[in-house]
Amino acid sequence: MPFFSYDTVKKILFNFDPETAHTLAGIGLRALPCCPPLLHFITKQYFVTDPMIEQEFFGRTFKNPVGLGAGFDKNGQYITSMPALGFGFTEIGTVTPKPQPGNPKPRLFRLLEDRSIQNAMGFNNRGMGYMLEQLNKLYFFDYPIGINIGKNKVTSEEKALEDYETLFHAFKDYGDYIVINISSPNTPGLRDLQNEQFIKDIFAMAKRITEQPVLLKIAPDMTHEDAIALCNTAVDAGAAGIIATNTTIDYSLTPHAKDFGGISGALLTEKSYQLFKAIGKELYGKTLLISVGGIDSAEEAYRRIKAGASLVQVYSMLIYKGPALIREINEGLIKLLKKDGYTHISEAIGADWK
């Protein structure tokens, strides 16, 4: 049993505005490694691994298939605390070449009735220099890390490749994979880069600079046909995988939405799944697929896995359910695999298409 109730913690944090609550949670996560006995104790409460759900990707062992989605740890400050929350891997960022404050506040909102989050953060982060400092502190920390990269707001679309080039050079020897983020709705013009020519150019550039696996993260707000075409272009150009999806700007999903920013959480679940399913049918077996967007249970994670996901990511639903959710997903996946007669998760990946 967990040694504390997340419901109690949530009640306290939800007394603050969302961004302040995030800052307070971050202070706790940064402090946790300073008390190894407590870190070890919490890790034992929440971290689940089993040969059935352990996998190898990019030359690294992923002890379980549930990772933290990008956006929570924008500056790489909480990496060593992530196993304590139950995650098998983490994705830090989005990081930009130069520090930037992001969009004006308020820019983060809880949609309580919908168990969702709406954010218009705008890649607020301390820049690549600060993140490199954090990564250089890790030394012998053996844990899969993805680095999510994006362009600065002040960088024009015409010069966007220059920002990504700078970031590829900076992180070519760090982490286990790099994610190209051109799908956030909160940087003006960024989603316009989701076109065939830019995809070809950026992956060609990546291959010249780094041997790191480079993945593409896509938005949910496109037709299935366009998404499949974009992903095929990326894979043909050298993408090591696809992450689907980012937040949605479909404000028709709820009457509680603001008219700006991206929506994540429960409202995104079905939209994200349907797009991922279309991509999975086309690309399963051709590249690594990671599904993210409103995953709030083992059953939902399993649905994504059967549609082709080798890994899944969680962020917004962590805020509503706490780290017990990650434990429940991993334990639930083991039960679901056994129920269907599988001996390893790899047998279930893409089961809908076998």
From Swiss-Prot:
GO cellular component entries: cytoplasm; plasma membrane
Residues the entry annotates as binding substrate: 74, 119-123, 181, 186, 246-247
Tell me the residue numbers annotated for binding FMN: 70-74, 94, 148, 181, 217, 245, 265, 294, 315-316
What pathway is this protein a component of? Answer: Pyrimidine metabolism; UMP biosynthesis via de novo pathway; orotate from (S)-dihydroorotate (quinone route): step 1/1
This protein's UniProt keywords: Cell membrane, Flavoprotein, FMN, Membrane, Oxidoreductase, Pyrimidine biosynthesis
Q: What is its EC number?
A: 1.3.5.2
**Where is this chain primarily localised?**
membrane
Instruction: Output the Pfam families linked to this UniProt entry.
Output: DHO_dh
Write out the annotated subcellular location: Cell membrane
Molecular function via GO: dihydroorotate dehydrogenase (quinone) activity
Cofactor info, note text:
Binds 1 FMN per subunit.
Reading the lineage from the top rank, the first entry is Bacteria
Catalysis performed (reactions): (S)-dihydroorotate + a quinone = orotate + a quinol
What is its membrane topology?
Peripheral membrane protein
**Top-level EC class:** oxidoreductase
Cofactor(s) named in the record: FMN
- Task performed by this protein: Catalyzes the conversion of dihydroorotate to orotate with quinone as electron acceptor.
UniProt name for this protein: Dihydroorotate dehydrogenase (quinone)
User: To which species is this protein native?
Assistant: Sulfurovum sp. (strain NBC37-1)
Taxonomy, top ranks, is: Bacteria, Pseudomonadati, Campylobacterota, Epsilonproteobacteria, Campylobacterales
